[in-house]
């Protein structure tokens, strides 16, 4: 059983606001939908839940489940 952190994304898009800012719990890289992700060529305005399945943290290559909600 893996450890769960309060606020972790864990793939549950139904509980995530479109403007929610998330942070990687490995390296603290933030994903802000207002900014998108230039490394992965994700345009501004793209909610975290709408990121492609292959998207990973641009800093540490952690998967989406390593992100937790910090605002939203």
From Swiss-Prot:
Keywords: Electron transport, Iron, Metal-binding, Transport. PROSITE patterns: RUBREDOXIN (PS00202), RUBREDOXIN_LIKE (PS50903). GO terms for biological process: alkane catabolic process. The keyword Iron applies. SUPFAM superfamilies: Rubredoxin-like. Binds 1 Fe(3+) ion per subunit. This is Rubredoxin.
